[in-house]
Regions:
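Active-site metal-binding loops of divalent metal-dependent hydrolases
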Residues: 32-34, 57, 102-104, 114-115, ...
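Core dinuclear metal-dependent hydrolase active-site scaffold
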Residues: 20-22, 85-112, 116, 147
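Active-site HxH/HxHxD metal-binding segment of metal-dependent hydrolases
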Residues: 14, 27, 34-98
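An active-site-proximal "capping" alpha-helix that borders the catalytic cofactor pocket
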Residues: 131-157
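Active-site-flanking alpha-helical
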Residues: 63-64, 109-110, 127, 165
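Conserved acidic residues
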Residues: 50, 120, 152
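Conserved beta-strand hairpin/beta-sheet module of binuclear metal-dependent hydrolase folds
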Residues: 4-45, 108-119
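Accessory terminal helices/loops
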Residues: 143, 147-153, 162-236
């Protein structure tokens, strides 16, 4: 699916989503658990796999790494050692790394053109669990992603859309953006735009009046952005 010079292909394995970024000749696998389908795609499109990497090192995102490395000449890029703002070149086009700790210490996002592969940091209509326990760091990572252009396409690490929209609707039953996304999203090529996320994802709506009223109704701290976001993270 083309979006600028670097194209993106999405693959499923369970509820996980794997990705291939590619130019005219070179490709990069991210969380490549669907390794057989990725190898088939590479062969069909005459692509050379140059890099294998991950959004983070949790086991469900890494099962394809050894298979892809063993069957190609690709280099492994360890997400734990990638630098913030590091540029990985595919046919001369940059894929930019953002370090986004929170879900895990080693979480990174990959930005190519308008496409952002977010792993378990930002999902479609929700965010990841904060397994590090560093809520402040996670909040700063989310704020950083929110500052990107509104037309940025969000490609997440899992398809949690149905449950995420159900929870978002539970918090904001009168929000039409939630149902609109449910009706229009493509389950075979799943993404949202950052503009859509800002309209439906409760964890990006901490400054919006309906969310502030919700926190007030539940008698939760809401004086600052940080307090509102912390309060949202406590709601189940």
């Amino acid at each position: 699916k083309e979006n600028g010079m670097i194209q993106i292909e999405q693959f499923r394995y369970g509820d996980n989503l794997a990705y291939l970024l590619y130019g005219k000749t070179a490709a990069m696998a991210i969380d490549g658990g669907a390794w057989q389908e990725i190898l088939t795609f590479l062969k069909q499109h005459g692509l050379s796999l140059r890099f294998v990497t991950n959004t983070h090192r949790h086991y469900d995102h890494t099962p394809g790494d050894d298979h892809l490395l063993g069957k190609t000449k690709a280099a492994f890029l360890d997400c734990r050692t990638l630098a913030d703002h590091e540029k990985i070149l595919l046919d001369g086009e940059p894929v930019v790394v953002y370090r986004t700790p929170g879900h895990s210490k080693d979480s990174v996002c990959f930005h190519a053109g308008n496409d952002l592969i977010t792993g378990d940091t930002l999902f479609n209509a929700t965010i990841g669990n904060c397994f590090t326990g560093d809520l402040r760091g996670f909040f700063e990572s989310i704020q950083r992603l929110m500052a990107l252009p509104d037309d940025t396409r969000i490609f997440a690490g899992h398809d949690y859309v149905r449950d995420s929209l159900t929870f978002a609707r539970h918090l904001e039953p009168d929000n039409p953006a939630i149902e609109r996304f449910r009706q229009t999203c493509d389950p075979y090529f799943l993404y949202s735009t950052l503009a859509q996320e800002k309209k439906m994802n409760p964890y990006l709506r901490f400054n919006e009046e309906p969310i502030v009223r919700l926190l007030q109704k539940r008698k939760l701290p809401r004086a600052t952005e940080w307090e509102r976001w912390q309060s949202l993270m406590t709601i189940e």
